[in-house]
């Protein structure tokens, strides 16, 4: 089954991919790697804001990380034409807007990792880092950066 | 027009490239990519210090990010001999020393992105992430990391 | 002398490599690069926790960064079979759990850089970034991410 078919089968709908808000671009192919700009957590209501350990729970963070991954897939579909062009997910860097001492960034970034494996299977397994930071664009709860390999 | 000519035409002068302060190096070529160490914001008076949202404005941050990009170009010129060896800018990671909840890291990192496009044109467009962090070396206002592709 | 022999000669023992705690993997080879997941600081007693500038000194941070580098080498040995397969260390990103305004992340990440050069010599010299962040997994003092090139 192709990835596009897998997405259709799950009923997952990708969001509209965002435009870059400055002199940068959303995706760049170099050789067989596609580098992606960091995207912030959004849903149909707008930016998912807040701070883990302050006014946001781990569950809300998990949903925000999943939303970031969906946005990155939307960016990739626009960039590549189809997600079936992706050979594998290489790396994910997840940044969580968090209070000092918040010890669960991984439980939040799991929202992205789980989605990628749900859609891509073993090829969706990636290396990653999960970091808590003091400030993200538009006060987003999560920012996610990714590199993927194409065939 | 070559990039070196473009820089000369704008009157931009690159700073002296910094030396690595430990057991690491400023730049490393692997295949057709050049990976660069993070550099902190400096001008002719020394390190540009401070914290966005506390004692530094967005405009000061923008200038600090631009200064980082100039420093990275100086590192690249030393590493490659000439900036004309650069095929394109691939990625920029910008870290802003920021108070918790500062929502404008992108407006600061634009200082780097705008400079890269000013000098390299479309080949200067890159993917990027803009993150606010609690602490940077020597209390710098901005740290910038970059990857470029060579011909 | 091979790297494995060099390690044996120094008496350094690598720790047990950690398992990935979710839908991600510890290492992934793409072309001649091996990307590694971020690892947190641990020793034989468990996670090395704490915050630089609050309850941890630079010396404790240096030891924690060195411990992260040892863990990453253990991951690489498991992934590649032998550390002799490594051609060179490419990049290191070091994140330090730090109070706002802590100005010495590089002195802490030197613990990793020094170890890599101790073991790999000139091939261990890498590009790097050292960043202070507000929160790391399990309240770890240091998290380290690395990319290496293989022959």
What are these regions (language model features)?
Chain A
Residues 1-151:
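Short, polar/acidic, helix-capping and beta-turn segments at strand->helix junctions
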């Amino acid at each position: 089954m192709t990835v596009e078919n897998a997405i259709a089968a799950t009923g997952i709908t990708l969001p509209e991919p965002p435009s870059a808000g400055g002199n940068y671009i959303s995706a760049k192919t170099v050789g067989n790697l596609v580098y992606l700009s960091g995207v912030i957590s959004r849903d149909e209501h707008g930016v998912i804001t807040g701070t883990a350990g302050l006014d946001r729970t781990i569950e809300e963070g998990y949903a925000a990380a999943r939303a970031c991954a969906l946005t990155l897939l939307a960016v990739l579909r626009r960039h590549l034409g189809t997600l079936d062009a992706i050979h594998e997910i290489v790396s994910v860097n997840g940044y969580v807007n968090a209070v000092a001492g918040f010890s669960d960034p991984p439980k939040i970034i799991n929202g992205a990792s789980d989605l990628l494996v749900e859609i891509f299977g073993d090829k969706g397994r990636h290396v990653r880092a999960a970091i808590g930071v003091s400030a993200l664009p538009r006060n987003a709860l999560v920012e996610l950066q990714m590199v993927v390999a194409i065939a």
